[in-house]
Amino acid sequence: MSFRDLRNFTEMMRALGYPRHISMENLRTPNFGLVSEVLLWLVKRYEPQTDIPPDVDTEQDRVFFIKAIAQFMATKAHIKLNTKKLYQADGYAVKELLKITSVLYNAMKTKGMEGSEIVEEDVNKFKFDLGSKIADLKAARQLASEITSKGASLYDLLGMEVELREMRTEAIARPLEINETEKVMRIAIKEILTQVQKTKDLLNNVASDEANLEAKIEKRKLELERNRKRLETLQSVRPCFMDEYEKTEEELQKQYDIYLEKFQNLTYLEQQLEEHHRMEQERFEEAKNTLCLIQNKLKEEEKRLLKSGSNDDSDVDIQEDDESDSELEERRLPKPRTAMEVLMQGRPGKRIVGTMQGGDSDDNEDSEESEIDMEDDDEDEDDDLEDESISLSPTKPNRRVRKPEPLDESDNDF
């Protein structure tokens, strides 16, 4: 739909003489009443005597109206219309209406109003109602086929007329014999009487057959009633095996309930087992990772202790000789304990491979017996360093930590 189509349609309808004013806003929304009036008026312009019902109240009437208009325009004006767009009765229907109005408008422009009136008068001379003539057309076709068949049979009979004429002439010319005529009449009467007797016998047989059928029907009814009563009796009587059947059914139901319960328990336990295996696998992986971390930290701590031990030995050589034994002991003894405390604080709650008890016990003894002998303290300190080096590297027992020689020299100084 476009503004140009709406404008052309309104101008063409005004030029064709449509009595009602059509605004361009009328067809922007669905307006089936206006579209039906325009279609009926355009059809009247083509064929004033056409008979199309104008009822558009119900949906069925509107569909029939649109189909009739489309059929008329296709047969009369050879214009193919889109019934779906016409039924929408909005801007899309304007394009379909323009197909009709453009033909009328062009005819009016070429020949003028007078020429168009003359053409309409000429067309009215040969008007016909297609809807009312369809039945006549079917009847004419049937009569034409009958005429053909009857004409063929009549032609055959006329071909036999020569022989039949001679036979007819001989029969008419031959005199009638009373005795022979009576004989023929009697034979015919006997045949008729025989047929009548046969018909009476058939009627009697029909009556007897009817009686027999009624008797059979009555007998069947009695049997049906007797069987129905027997069925009711059987239904009212409880079978002897019904108690056992019900008991067996209850037992089966109990067994089925037990089976369901056990099956559910089995399924639950299998699920728990799978969960347990999964958790064990996770724990194993976690322990493995933890062990790797501990080993790495122990290696780092071992390296750090070696570096710190070498640094401490160099510091002892630089110190002056007038330092007291107590000050030297306070610098040297807490260093291994500090390294072990750092290691224990790094992995709280985890199991350490190896033993750390030797160093701790020796430190305690050194703290208690620090006033007895300085040389014993130095020897205990050497033992502590060896024990700590062994405990820090449990995975590599063949690797030994070499004690730095400056420590012995520093001890000898004292």
Swiss-Prot record:
The keyword Coiled coil applies. InterPro entries: Clusterin-associated_protein-1 (IPR019366). Its main location: other. The modification Phosphoserine is found at residues 314, 324, 326, 410. GO terms for cellular component: cilium; intraciliary transport particle B; microtubule organizing center; nucleus. GO terms for biological process: cilium assembly. Pfam families: Cluap1. The keyword Phosphoprotein applies. Required for cilia biogenesis. Appears to function within the multiple intraflagellar transport complex B (IFT-B). Key regulator of hedgehog signaling. Belongs to the CLUAP1 family. This is Clusterin-associated protein 1. It comes from Macaca fascicularis (Crab-eating macaque).
